[in-house]
Amino acid sequence: MAVSRRAVGVESARKVLQLLLCFDAARPRAAVTELARAAGLPLSSAYRHLALLREQGLVEEDGGGRYRMTPRVHALARAADAASPLVAAAQPILARLAGETGATAVLFRIFGDVAVAAAAVEPRRPAHLSGVSGRSFPLHKGAPCKLLLASLPATVRAAVLDRIERADPAERALRRQREAELVLIRRRGYAESDGEVDPGMWAVAAPVTQKRRTIASLWLAAPARRLDAARRTALREATRAGAQALTRSLAMPPDPGQARHARY
């Protein structure tokens, strides 16, 4: 019985967090119905979990029946960035990648059933993709998300796919296709997507590892219309080199007062 209560508690906590992660730069405000649909929750559950988030001062109603995050969440985000050696180590590598390739460079981390853009650097020239940092995406859509999903242990990966199917029954027909794609991603060591999340954008992602475990994905995205075969090959190579550089940087012993850098 104790195990059952714990399982129920964990599932409830997961749903609260999924609801909070529905907010991002593309969706700073949302009605309860929209949040429930995005999180795959019954409307009654969404109301209940939002009440808890309001009680903790993490969301508030804007007066028009829509909800938004409070400044308390921004403070948590700043604290997370300040404390994260991963984000600190990634920033110079993302900046170099964006500057040298002209693509948007983003670091993604996995939180529950979503991937969150933990850090992003946009190129100087227009890239038709902005406001990525802080956005969250489902694990079965987009190169960085699918790469993270592919890296999970088999039982965890299957559980995630099961939850995705419960939220969207249409996904059941795609299960074998999804699993085959994840096998391919693991075999070749990177993932690609073309307009899967952002229309007109081609993207490639590579794994960042620590102690032989994938902890993040590094992603480059650029308008597909600008990319011929040679350019896509160059972006694949740059993405993998950047991810390997970040992996090496994380393996270096910390140097107090100095940022760690690993050249790719």
Question: Where are the regions that the model predicts?
Answer:
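Signal-transducing coiled-coil/dimerization helices and immediately adjacent hinge/linker segments
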Residues: D255-Y264
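Short, structured helix-loop boundary elements
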Residues: G9-A13, T70, A83, V87, ...
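Extended hydrophobic
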Residues: A170-A245, Y264
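Amphipathic alpha-helical regulatory segments at dimerization interfaces
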Residues: H49, A89-E100, L184, R188, ...
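Amphipathic alpha-helical effector-binding/dimerization core
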Residues: G65-R163
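N-terminal helix-turn-helix
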Residues: M1-A83, V87, Q244-M252
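A structural signal for short hydrophobic beta-strand segments in well-ordered beta-sheet cores
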Residues: V59-E60, L107-F108, V208
